[in-house]
Amino acid sequence: MYDVRHVLRKAGLRSTYSGYNYLASAVALVLKDQEFYLKNVTSNLYRVVGEQYGVSNMCVEAAIRTLINSYWNQNSNKILSPLLGYPVFDKPTASEFISMLADYIQDHSSR
């Protein structure tokens, strides 16, 4: 199994953002049960991550969004597209980003 934080670092994400830990936890949860957690991201995924860290689901979402915005403004798709192996033209939403990273880890952990 791939280490989620290793993949986040490989993608160029900075651990200085609180959203980094929330994102790592969110991706790990999605790897356990993608259908459940991605069905209703706010009330399923962000709620559980928020409970782990003692914050609200809105705080989790905002922190992950801030991390993605900063990442995208600095890197655009220069790192993400080559890492994933397909072009990413537009900034992904938080749930899309989580899904992309989880898919990448699933694809590469089975090799």
Protein language model annotation of sequence segments:
Residues 26-30, 64, 71:
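AAA+ P-loop ATPase catalytic core
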Residues 48-50:
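Short alpha-helical "recognition helix" segments of helix-turn-helix
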